[in-house]
């Protein structure tokens, strides 16, 4: 087994056995710039979709000045939507940088990760720059406020999105959902397993 395969096998094992909380990369953001929201109600919404449903299409502005749509990946790549509740908060500021160690797993399964928040583009742009940049597109569901989050049934009563993951296949069908306790990062193991199932 060459070094690359050994490294991938080790990362896979870690992902399947450990939650992302144990694997997250440092945010790079000084603690005095992070807003501590305290303990929140774990869930505050009702899903409007289920596994097997077609995913709602979307067109969202990204922090690089472009636009991302679900349609642009149809027939080409699976898509993972990673929703976080709010920029500049502790858990969110650790979650997305944590994906840096699994970029090759997304690529190996023909899967595009898209980060989504209901924050506006300037806020997201400043936050991502402070984190040192990310390898995946970051999109704003700010206007109409939370439209995509609402269509999925993950818009909380305070206007934030639930911390959640949606895996959508190349045909636009939802194959995996994790609406997670807003106070902690989700375990990526089950998501990686679902991504690999689509690769078979």
Locate each region found by the language model.
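Short acidic-hydrophobic, aromatic-tinged amphipathic segments that line or gate anion-handling sites
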Residues: 137-141
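Short active-site neighborhood of thiol/selenol oxidoreductases, capturing the structured segment around
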Residues: 70-99
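Structural micro-motif
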Residues: 135-136, 154-166
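N-terminal targeting signals for export/organelle localization
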Residues: 2-61
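Thiol-/selenol-based redox modules, centered on thioredoxin-like
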Residues: 160-200
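Structural microenvironment flanking redox-active thiols in thiol-disulfide oxidoreductases
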Residues: 91-134, 144-148
């Amino acid at each position: 087994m060459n070094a690359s395969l050994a490294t991938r096998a080790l990362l896979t094992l870690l992902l399947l056995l450990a939650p992302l909380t144990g694997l997250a990369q440092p945010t790079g953001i000084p603690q005095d710039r992070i807003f501590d929201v305290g303990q929140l109600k774990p869930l505050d919404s009702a899903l409007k979709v289920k596994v097997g449903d077609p995913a709602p299409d979307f067109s969202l502005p990204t922090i690089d000045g472009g636009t991302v749509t679900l349609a642009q990946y149809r027939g080409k790549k699976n898509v993972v939507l990673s929703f976080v509740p709010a920029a500049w908060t502790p858990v969110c500021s650790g979650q997305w940088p944590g994906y840096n160690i699994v970029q090759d797993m997304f690529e190996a399964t023909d899967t595009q990760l898209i980060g989504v928040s209901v924050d506006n583009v300037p806020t997201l742009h400043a936050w991502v720059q402070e984190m040192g940049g990310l390898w995946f597109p970051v999109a704003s569901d700010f206007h109409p406020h939370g439209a995509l989050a609402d269509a999925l049934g993950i818009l909380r009563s305070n206007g934030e999105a639930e911390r959640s993951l949606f895996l959508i296949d190349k045909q636009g069908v939802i194959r995996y959902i994790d609406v997670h306790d807003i106070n902690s990062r989700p375990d990526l193991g089950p998501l990686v397993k679902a991504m690999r199932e689509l690769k078979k």
